[in-house]
Amino acid sequence: MNKPTHDTRNGLLCALAVAAALWASYPVAEMGFIDDWSYIKTAQMFAQTGHFVYNGWAVEILGWQVLWGALFIKLFGFSFTITRLSMLPVVMATIFLLHSILRRFGVTPRNAIFGTLTFGLSPLFLPLAGSFMTDVPGVFVILLCLYLCKRAVDAGTARSTIAWLTLAAASNALGGSVRQIAWLGALVMLPSTGWLLRKRRGVLLASFFLWGISAAAIFLTMQWFSHQPYSLPEPILPPAGLNPIKHSIHLLFQLSGALLCILLMVFPILVAWLTTVRSLNSAALSKLALITATFGVFEWITSWTAPWLYHVLSAEFDPNRNGENGAAMFPGLPKWGRETISLLVVVTALILLRQLRSKLWPQLKSWAKGRTALPSPWQDILWLLGPFTVCYFLLLIPRGYRFVISDTYLLPIIPIAILCLLLLHQRWIAKPIPRISFAVLAIFALLSVAGTHD
């Protein structure tokens, strides 16, 4: 069996595994999940009238997701379950795409399967996969753009490079209508890729031409959305009159919680760094213990819930939190259980941070001064995903300043973290992921299925 066929088989198996986990959770309930009742209503109205009918709740355009859901409603009749079931092909395509991306960036076959399942079976992705929320379709559009941009990087000629970039621009400009944040693919990832490939003839000019066309299409789509009855555009900048000190402190907690939440979702990979704790000297171990203990005491005293953020994770794992209909949801984990997992996340993150400081940081400084070149996958990651990630977090800041950064907002960043951690593990520790990581993944998968079911 040749390599492409082998990778295709593994990607399909990952997609089927996530679909099987979703079916095992039996996500059947004729009621809303977070905001998807509003989106389902819009799909139902489109199936009945052929028009987009908003209801004053959604800040997302919804785009092709409404058409896709309406198709299933037309074919099988309306129900919450049927409309949510329409997302299953999108869920499986997202998982397949992620596996393909990991392989293209140089992740080994075994680790690519592990990384894909870490995302697909996570307590954040699986409940959203069983809903009609726009988060998973948004991630699909972003991953599709990343895949096409990576194909452009790997292309052998300037003509094929431009063709791949054209597909990336077209798919993102159209697909991003489901969730506006996905348009960062065409607005940021595309020109970043063009700049990386600027030495190829005509690529830089073509990429910025495609960027202009995409920006114009996005502007016209937003104009159309703003004129729809009961649409709900969300301003980027926070309103005047807010207490800057109070809200800045609030923002700091929100961003810190978001980072911890991302680390929690990649914990099956992150836990592999525990195998390196024996290489730490006594001074490093003392600092590690002090920081971890300080974090634990602070979180216990203040009842800070990070990394168990609102919406999905808090509903799954906090026994003191009620569902939006007032009924108790998944019994959750006791406080000591959540605290223990949080402390383990902090410990492994600190070990990783120490390794990044000692090994990666000198390489980045040498590259910045022009002394050395970054290895191929890291140069591609830097240009394709670096500006995208920065812009993504910049757009989260106004939300965190005013309200909260929900765990669902972090879904597109988790595949990036998975990719980077797997490559770092392969380079610095060992090629295969250790057995302890598989054990943690199995526990996470069981919790995800149970939480999604309830």
Mark where each language-model region is:
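Transmembrane alpha-helix segments characteristic
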Residues: 15-18, 282-322, 364-399
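Membrane-proximal lumenal/periplasmic loop motifs of glycosylation machinery
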Residues: 24-34, 48-88
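Short acidic/glycine- and proline-prone juxtamembrane loop motifs at membrane-interface regions
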Residues: 33-34, 127-138, 178-181, 406-407
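Transmembrane-helix motifs of polytopic, lipid-linked glycan transferases
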Residues: 85-106, 121, 144-148
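Membrane-interface transmembrane helices that cradle and orient dolichyl/undecaprenyl
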Residues: 103-109, 145-164, 193-199, 425
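Membrane-interface alpha helices of multi-pass inner-membrane proteins
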Residues: 115-117, 161-179, 186-191, 211-217, ...
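Membrane-lumen/periplasm interface segments of specific transmembrane helices
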Residues: 191, 195-326
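Signature aromatic-anchored transmembrane alpha helix within multi-pass, membrane-resident enzymes
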Residues: 212-213, 287-295, 338-350, 354-389, ...
